[in-house]
């Protein structure tokens, strides 16, 4: 595809779903898959899948399905799996500690390498082989370690302040678990994860689409 071509945001958000399914199929020794199978596995309608895949180039032929190896190669390049992605997490409360302990154990390409908090009792603690540093060290550490992706699990009343500091440190992506809808410049991507909203959405679909 042309270098200046941009895949739609909605399609990009589905890439990890496609990649995980294709990886599973590859592990089962399957070399081709059609949109119907993908649709049934992911509960995404076939038309959406075909439209998404039309942005991905020549991954298959009509009547033959999509080539698993070609899809894996494409998804790896788009999701930057060829490079080790270093991530920092800020706010080591219950959620932050759980994420740090888990530390993407099934994703070898992503690793939380830095953790920050302000509480004296947790500074210096080793959690999941990562030593917690004081938040005063965020900017210098992120710059020296060339980290531009951060998970934010701070209290919501300081989330925007921390986000502003992250922008100054050159961060380009924030996964925000706080209730605060933080604001950043256009070149800084923020994904908001709100468990309450996700549960409400789940309950809605259970009520209206499970019959």
Swiss-Prot record:
InterPro entries: CoA-bd, NAD(P)-bd_dom_sf, Rex_DNA-bd_C_dom, Tscrpt_rep_Rex, WH-like_DNA-bd_sf, WH_DNA-bd_sf. NAD(+) binds at residues 91-96. Coiled coil: none annotated. GO terms for molecular function: DNA binding; DNA-binding transcription factor activity. GO terms for biological process: negative regulation of DNA-templated transcription; response to redox state. Residues 17-56 bind DNA. The keyword NAD applies. One of its GO terms (cellular component) is cytoplasm. Its main location: cytoplasm. It is found in: Cytoplasm. Pfam families: CoA_binding, Put_DNA-bind_N. It comes from the Bacteria. Keywords: Cytoplasm, DNA-binding, NAD, Repressor, Transcription, Transcription regulation. Homodimer. Belongs to the transcriptional regulatory Rex family. Modulates transcription in response to changes in cellular NADH/NAD(+) redox state. This is Redox-sensing transcriptional repressor Rex. It comes from Staphylococcus epidermidis (strain ATCC 12228 / FDA PCI 1200). The gene is rex.
């Amino acid at each position: 595809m042309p270098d200046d071509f941009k895949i739609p945001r909605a399609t990009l958000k589905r890439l990890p779903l496609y990649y995980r399914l294709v990886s599973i199929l590859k592990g089962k020794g399957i070399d081709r898959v059609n949109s119907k199978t993908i649709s049934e596995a992911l509960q995404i309608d076939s038309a959406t899948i075909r439209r998404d895949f039309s942005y991905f180039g020549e991954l298959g032929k009509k009547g033959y399905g999509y080539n698993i190896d070609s899809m894996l190669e494409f998804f790896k390049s788009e999701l930057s799996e060829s490079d080790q992605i270093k991530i920092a997490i800020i706010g080591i409360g219950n959620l932050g500690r759980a994420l740090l302990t888990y530390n993407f154990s099934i994703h070898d390409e992503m690793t939380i390498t830095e953790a920050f908090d302000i509480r004296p009792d947790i500074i210096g603690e080793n959690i999941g082989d990562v030593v917690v540093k004081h938040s005063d060290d965020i900017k210098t550490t992120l710059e020296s370690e060339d980290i531009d992706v951060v998970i934010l699990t701070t209290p919501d009343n300081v989330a925007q302040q921390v986000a502003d500091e992250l922008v100054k440190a050159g961060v380009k992506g924030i996964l925000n678990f706080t209730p605060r809808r933080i604001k950043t410049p256009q070149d800084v991507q923020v994904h908001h994860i709100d468990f309450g909203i996700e549960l409400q959405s789940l309950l809605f679909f259970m009520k209206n689409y499970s019959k």
